[in-house]
A protein has these predicted regions:
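A compositional/biophysical signature of low hydrophobicity enriched in polar/charged and small residues
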Residues: 1-180
Length: 180
């Protein structure tokens, strides 16, 4: 697999690397590992004993499995989910970006710029009619305008389209854990 360059712990893959094989650790997940992942995604603040009770293990084997899932990179980190509205970030914007330049050097510069912008919550390279999609959160239109001006001055862009979310209908953080 050819990696362009890590940016803030994220890896950007070259376009020829779309077929990424399953990581070996994914093949080793058994039913108990999957239960642990489901429980942790619901509430990562549970004690190891509580998690063990829910999945049918005592504390030590449960803790060893959690450590292995972390070491294998299946569990990336444990975080607190914060209500964006309660901290004054009431506007969500989906920003579509089109570029005339598709070189690796341009992508590195663009990825560095976007990754340094704290308003950007998610950043994707897309297939289809746009090249990149960003999910951005800001306090108000004035804050978005400041963000927009930073974005368009970072690198040459062909087109930027902003779509403002009117209402959040569904938002989950727990991944659907596939059966073994």
């Amino acid at each position: 697999m050819r990696v362009l360059r890590p940016v803030n712990g994220t890896k950007f893959f070259a376009m020829t690397d779309l077929a990424i094989p399953l990581h070996e650790s994914n093949r080793r997940l058994d039913a108990i590992d999957r239960k642990i992942l489901t429980v942790l995604q619901e509430d990562a603040s549970l004690s190891v004993a509580e998690i063990g009770d829910r999945v049918g293990l005592s504390s030590t084997p449960c803790w060893k499995r959690i450590q292995r899932l972390e070491a294998d990179g299946v569990i990336l980190r444990r975080v607190a989910l914060v209500d964006q509205n309660k901290i004054g970030l009431g506007i969500t914007v989906f920003v579509s970006v089109e570029s005339a330049d598709h070189s690796e050097a341009w992508l590195r510069k663009f990825a560095d710029a976007v990754s340094s912008m704290p308003e950007v919550m998610e950043f994707y390279r897309m297939a289809g009619d746009v090249d990149y999609m960003l999910r951005v959160v800001v306090a108000d239109m004035q804050s978005y305008d400041v963000f927009y001006k930073k974005l368009i001055s970072a690198v040459p862009l062909k087109n930027v389209t902003s779509r403002f979310a009117m209402e959040k209908i569904k938002s989950v953080t727990a991944l659907p854990i596939p059966a073994a």
